[in-house]
Structures are given as structure tokens and as C-alpha cells.
Amino acid sequence: MASSSHRYFALLALFAVSLKFCYCQNETTDGAGWGTAGVTWYGEPLGAGSTGGACGFAVANPPLYGMVSAGGPSVFNNGIGCGTCFQILCNGHPACSRRPITVTITDECPGGPCASEPAHFDLSGKAMGALARPGQGDRLRSAGVLRVYYIRVECLYRRTNIAFRMDPGANPYYISFVVEYENGDGDLAYTEIQPAGGTFIPMQEMRSAVWKVNSGSPLTGPFNIRLTSAESHNVVVAYNVIPANWKPNETYRSVVNFK
């Protein structure tokens, strides 16, 4: 009888673990399970990493709040990884909280351990501290390269809509901007711009999350922007989001986002 009871409770435990695993898998955008990666950190111990980074995002402000990471070559993926979101779970060090955190890829980590491992995340100091138990952030930051579990998840920026930050070199003949805070996939397959009185024009991804269009004649606003997500192929249109009197370096917020 004792042996039967033991097997019964073992099966219950296995079933509970399976349910938890399936729940985590359902949050992924590509259906893959948890993988293993190396983790380091950079910048100030409580800071948001680099300002802007290779992706050009404003990393310290809401909704990112410094919970960001640079990605090694496989994660950054020549800029395609900009804006994608990952959960990271640390449980191999005594200071680990064993609770997952979510980070957004905002920068590139091209060398050192980032390039020597199949997957690597170089977290901001703030994000690294968030992996730790209360009061153990400094201990975890001084641990060197950590082994963690990671999984791709959908981005979810609550109460935040997609924003367009104009490139410093943008002008009426050359319109370029960074697309920020997309829910869902976090990366885009297509970006199209529609000037006043015109039709939608395909834009080119110049670098990372920056999209551009070169025009033989000046384009005038207000502009509509149509976005297509890379994996789910969902489409949203931000109407009149960039005004006629737009300026370089300014950020224009839409009233839409992917669900």
C-alpha cells in the first residue's frame, strides 16, 4: 500500500510540473521550450545599461524602466532581435531568486562571452539585480558569467502604445524613425508610410529598429504608418501619427498597439 501511495503522489507531482511547463510554453511566440544561456551585466550596478544602444531605444524611461538586455549574436540577430522580449530564470546560484524576469533586447553584445556561447544575454545592472533574492543583487552581479534558463515571450507594455522617434538625420526627402514598444512579436516584417494625399510606401529597415524611405520629392504630413508584425503577421495602422510639422529627434506616440 505504501508503495502504491508513493507512486500516486509521484504521478501527481509529475502532472503538476507538466502543467506548469505547458503554461510557460503557451506564452512563447515560437513554440520552443526553455533553453540555457550565459548571463553577464554591464553599465552601472543599478542602471539601465547603455543609453539608446544599438537599437536606439530610450531604455531608462517607461515602459522599459531599465529592464533591458544586450543580446549576443544569436539573440541580437543583426538587429532583427531589437524589441523582442525574453523571460530569464536564474536558479544555479545561492543568490538567485528562482523567479523569472522579463527583459527587452535593446542593444548588441558582439564580443567576449557573448560571442563564445550559443546564446548570451548581457543585462543592465538593474535587470541583473532583479534576478537576485532581496538584498543579494551585489552578490549576484559579482558572480561572473551565470548559467540561466531563457524563453522567448510576447512583449506586453501595459497602458503603452507604439511610438515613433524621428531619426536625427530625417528630413522631407529622407524620413526615418525608430519604432518602439510593439506588443506581441516585438519585431516587424513591414513598415509602410502614407503621406498626405498619397498611398502607402514601403520603408526599408536601415539598422536594427530604424526604418527609412528615400524620396525624390519631399513628403508632407500628416503621415499614417502601417505596421506588420514579423511572426504573427498582424497589422495595425497609426493614423496621422506623425504631424505635418514634425521635427528630427522628436517622439510621436500613436493610439494603437498590437493586441
Swiss-Prot record:
Official protein name in the record:
Expansin-B6
Q: Family assignment?
A: Belongs to the expansin family. Expansin B subfamily.
Repeat listed as a keyword: no
Organism per entry: Arabidopsis thaliana
The lineage, from the top, is: Eukaryota, Viridiplantae, Streptophyta, Embryophyta, Tracheophyta
Determine the domain of life of the protein's source: Eukaryota
- UniProt signal peptide: 1-24
User: Where are the coiled-coil regions?
Assistant: none
Tell me where it mainly resides. secreted
UniProt keyword terms in alphabetical order: Cell wall, Disulfide bond, Glycoprotein, Membrane, Secreted, Signal
Which residues does the UniProt record annotate as the domain Expansin-like EG45?
52-160
Purpose of the protein: May cause loosening and extension of plant cell walls by disrupting non-covalent bonding between cellulose microfibrils and matrix glucans.
**Which InterPro entries does the annotation name?**
Expan_Lol_pI, Expansin/allergen_DPBB_dom, Expansin_CBD, Expansin_CBD_sf, LolPI, RlpA-like_DPBB, RlpA-like_sf
